[in-house]
Curated annotation (Swiss-Prot):
Substrate binds at R13, K14, S104, Q105, R106, Q171. SUPFAM superfamilies: FMN-linked oxidoreductases (SSF51395). Homooctamer. Dimer of tetramers. It comes from Thermococcus onnurineus (strain NA1). One of its GO terms (molecular function) is isopentenyl-diphosphate delta-isomerase activity. This is Isopentenyl-diphosphate delta-isomerase. GO terms for cellular component: cytoplasm.
Length: 374
């Protein structure tokens, strides 16, 4: 049997991740918390639905809709599948003028021949594109740790506009071949940010960002946070199906629903920082997306619902899903009397249940609802 090197194993793992997301139920067993967030219906909205403006500004660019296609893949075995997915998503993003990310580029850094699986400029010359590297690769205890050279390579090889640094300690801790080196990551990111000429987005992958972490990230100049909250795809769940033995399966199962729910994470980050927020994590309809926007997010990020049509190369299928979300956001805004996203952040919200209980212990909830969502 052939012995694979670490980079080849990374490429194989990316393929397995796509396969499990498509073929198995890898959703969290708990919600993302937005069922506890309620709009107050306005019987007299005092606006026309067709005057609603869904555009938003982010990192110096204006976008037509407050939705982002979250990074999913790249560098898979053979690379053709990842390339097909990314190009399909990019065509949809280009058509709708919304941003998109690519999956982790670790495979590309070590195996440059996989670069084409991330490259979409030939089909989406204008799309705001976000590259993607993992936080552990910048840790002081990581052999061959990354620095500005690798960060520049990730962005410039694919002509991206920004770089996401994904923080995924949960997934790494339950992954058979996971990288659990995180010592010195914040310092390394501060050093990178000081000389890196592109915006940096700190991104979680399903366990959420707390206000403590958000404050640290803001203090070193990070440009935006993708909260990547609990309630959508569970990467511990994905690793459960990849586990090689009973010990690994048990660990992944126990931590399947670990993390901070997306709604809670949005509230904490908005309360504690001034950073732009991308709300990903179980965003499966436009009403929940509108709630995230009302809570202070700039974008709602979506991944898994777009994967199935993207695997087929079905650009229209991807656009159809996104247009459904867009219409649901627009209709929600009409029913609360919000002409634009800025006004949506000022409409009354009622927070109940577990989400309220959590937030009352963590932040000044009345102050957040009254003053901190803008």
């Amino acid at each position: 049997m052939k012995a694979f090197d670490k980079e080849e194993l990374t490429i194989i793992r990316k393929f397995e991740h796509i396969e499990h997301c498509l073929k198995r139920n890898v959703q969290a067993h708990v919600s993302n918390g937005f069922e506890d967030v309620h709009f107050v219906h306005m019987s007299l909205p005092e606006i026309d639905k067709d005057e609603i403006d869904l555009s938003v500004e982010f990192l110096g660019r204006k976008f037509d809709y407050p939705i982002m296609i979250a990074g999913m893949t790249g560098g898979t075995k053979g690379s053709q599948l990842a390339g097909k997915i990314n190009k399909t998503l990019a065509k949809a993003a280009q058509e709708l003028n919304i941003p998109m990310g690519v999956g982790s580029q670790r495979a590309m850094i070590r195996k440059p021949e996989t670069w084409e699986s991330y490259y979409v400029r030939d089909v989406a010359p204008d799309v705001f594109l976000v590259g993607n590297l993992g936080a552990p690769q910048f840790a002081e205890t990581m052999p061959d740790r990354y620095g500005i050279e690798e960060a520049l390579k990730a962005v410039e090889t694919i002509q991206a506009d920004a770089l996401a640094i994904h923080m995924n300690p949960l997934q790494e801790s339950v992954q058979p071949e996971g990288d659990t080196q995180y010592r010195g990551v914040l310092k390394a990111l501060a050093e990178l940010k000081a000389e890196f000429p592109y915006p940096i987005i700190a991104k979680e992958t399903g366990a959420g960002v707390s206000m403590e972490v958000a404050i640290r990230l803001e203090s070193i100049g990070i440009d935006a946070i993708d909260v990547g909250g609990l309630g959508g795809t569970s990467w511990s769940g994905v690793e459960y199906y990849r586990a090689k033995d009973e010990l690994g399966r048990n660990l992944a199962l126990k931590f399947w629903d670990w993390g901070i729910k997306t709604a809670i994470s949005v509230a904490e980050v908005r309360y504690a920082t001034e950073l732009p927020i991308i709300a990903t994590g179980g965003m499966r309809d436009g009403i929940a997306m509108a709630k995230a926007l009302a809570m202070g997010a700039t974008f709602a990020g979506v991944a898994l619902p777009l994967l199935r049509p993207a695997v087929k190369g079905d650009v229209e299928g991807v656009i159809k899903v996104l247009e459904r979300y867009i219409e649901e956001i627009r209709n929600t805004m009409f029913l609360v009397g919000a002409r634009n996203v800025e006004e949506l952040r000022k409409v009354p919200l009622v927070i109940t249940g577990f989400t309220r209980e959590w937030l009352e212990q963590r932040i000044d909830l009345p102050v957040y609802l009254r003053d901190r969502r803008i």
